[in-house]
Amino acid sequence: MSKPGDYDAVRKDIIAQLKKPGYDDGSAGPVFVRLAWHSAGTYDLETDTGGSNGAGMRYEAEGGDPANAGLQHGRAFLEPVKEKHPWITYADLWTLAGVVAIEALGGPKVVWKPGRTDLVDDSKVPPRGRLPDATQGAEHLRAVFYRMGFNDQEIVALAGGHTLGRCHIDRSGFQGPWVNNPTRFSNQFFKLLLTLDWKPKTLPNGISQFVYVDPDAEEGDEPLMMLPTDIALKTDPAFRVWVDKYAADKDLFFDHFAKAFAKLMELGIKRDENDRVINADNVKGGYISAPKKSNHPTGPAKGAQGGCPVAASQGGCPRAKL
């Protein structure tokens, strides 16, 4: 066990968890980024609720939200780190894992500050429905991100995180990767958004996305995809300005993404002049596997509450928001 406050030791152990040959594209990095983003993206500026404090996904009210489907894998991958460093809160661990993954996968260094505490019950868990719905367009994106205090430039910068990972039809309802190398942070998302011919496609679950089928692809190759919210970045004039800039200038994108993601990680956090968090209970809550699953990233037991077996018999898992 490390000494309390030894975040470098925690970082090293997070990096040791990144390589996962049997999971997705061989890396837990993208799901760590999504876990960090979803843990903070519930913030509401007007009511000052939600945000990265609390680790509310330990409770069914937040962890069982369809928008967070699949994130139990990220939480489970990080359990060995928590067991080795029990002094770190889940809220700090999940956000730190996101910024560590971004840098380890070739992205920019994101400023991260500790001090978050974990909720001791679910009384302060934010309501569901605050995360973006990827089936929507520009107006929806602005409604969600303006609520958190972001502007158009920051919205587009954060969307560049789609250069990592892929969608799963049993989680978000969409299917496929955005880019050819989904475990390497780059500005490729913006380049492909602008240059490829994206065609609408309706998936078996009735949800529509956009795909590019490479005429030179080999049999079995998975087509790249874009979400309706991604296409909105290209078609909305104000968003498009930043898409063009980031496609042309990787360094600018990295700089803006790092600043926007650091801001995201601080949503709902208030600090004093010494950077100590002053709006938390300073009590560390215990681990609760929510939805009610094991600590292993193998999925729920058959019929487990919060899992997908029942939904699958009724036409598939409920569509989650991204």
Curated annotation (Swiss-Prot):
Cofactor-binding details, from the entry: Binds 1 heme b (iron(II)-protoporphyrin IX) group per subunit.
Cofactors that this protein relies on: heme b
Protein species of origin: Aspergillus fumigatus (strain ATCC MYA-4609 / CBS 101355 / FGSC A1100 / Af293)
Protein name: Putative heme-binding peroxidase
GO annotation terms (biological process): cellular response to oxidative stress; hydrogen peroxide catabolic process; response to reactive oxygen species
Lineage, highest ranks first: Eukaryota, Fungi, Dikarya, Ascomycota, Pezizomycotina
InterPro entries, A to Z: Ccp1-like (IPR044831), Haem_peroxidase (IPR002016), Haem_peroxidase_sf (IPR010255), Peroxidase_I (IPR002207), Peroxidases_AS (IPR019794), Peroxidases_heam-ligand_BS (IPR019793)
Keywords: Heme, Iron, Metal-binding, Oxidoreductase, Peroxidase
E.C. numbers: 1.11.1.-
Protein family according to the UniProt entry: Belongs to the peroxidase family. Cytochrome c peroxidase subfamily.
